[in-house]
Each structure stands twice: as structure tokens, then as C-alpha cells.
Amino acid sequence: MTKLDTLIQELCPDGVIYKPILDVADVLYGYPCQAKLFNSEANGMPLARIRDVLAGTTTTYTTENVPAMYNLQYGDLLVGMDGNFHVGNWKMNTGVLCQRVCKFCSKDEEYVILNSYLSHLLPPVMKRVEESKQSGTVKHLLAKDISTIKVPVPPIGVQREIVRILDNFTELTAELTAELTARKKQYEFYRNELLSFTMKSEW
């Protein structure tokens, strides 16, 4: 029996409770920023738009005086609201939440739900919401869609163990990806060298 199995058996023997996501997390919808104030010269505040959600970084800035409530900090959990409902963590030290991107934040991280648990939980949840939308048009995530979402909320101890397991897996995956990328470059180098030698020998 794994540590997770033991925790589940001890802390939630009757199963995990599902709660409306708005009962455990606050959602902030992005500010309608003015495009005419955007720039790529790092002038002003970094701007988190839909295209930036997965990467968690941006090259677009705004000089607009956006209310402070829309300011972002490192690690904030973002969801894109058009097209693909991507989920990602903001990786810059500051930023501004732009319209059609929303931010999720635990109402009570100490006793109810961890932000790190939400980070792992939301991608499959949003994928299901996205797939439930009619195809053939650009899909839009609406506030009413979010209000219908229910999520499993195990005890904090169980959440911490789930996060630990998934974080370790993510780290291993990143290491394997880096290794595969390096091997691919190595293969391409030797392939090009060998093909170059073959071509020379034919002359």
C-alpha cells in the first residue's frame, strides 16, 4: 500500500467530497486592456493574454494604468477563455491579467484546497469543459460554465501527497524531454556528418 493509499484510507475512508469550484476558489476575470497601449519594448507591465497562458511568459507589455487587483505575481494560476482552455502558471515576477484570461486562487489554502493541487486539477477539468462545447466555432469559456464545475476536494494531507507525486513526475518528464532533445540534436549532427561524407565520396 502506498502512502497515498494509506492517507486516503485514514483521512477519507468514505470517499472524496466533490464541491462547486466557486466554493473553494476565487476567479478573477481579466481587464479589458487597450491594444493601442501595447508594446514589445518592455515598457510598462508584462501582459498576460491567451497566447501566453501555457508558456507563462510574454513579450507584450502595456503602459495602461490598470487597477491593482489585476496585477499578477509569480505562480498565479491562469486559464485561457477562448479556443483551447489552456491552464498554466505565470512565470514572471509581475504582470497584468488581460481580458479572456482568468485567474484561479484558493479561498483557503491552509484548510480547504491548495493552489498547487488546483494547478494539477484544472487542466483535465478544463479539457472536459472544452470538449463539451460545440465544434465548428471558436469555443468560449463563460462564467456560467465555471459556475457548474465541481471538483474533488480531499483532505489537505491527501492533496499534498498528490501534488508531491505529480510534481516529481513532471520533473522527471522535463528531464527526459531535455535528454531526448539532446539526443535528437546529436542524431541530427551525426546524420548530417555521415550524409556529408557519403555525398563527398560520390564525387
Residue positions per predicted region:
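Accessory (non-catalytic) regions of SAM-dependent nucleic-acid methyltransferases
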Residues: 1-11, 202
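A short beta-sheet element
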Residues: 49, 68-123
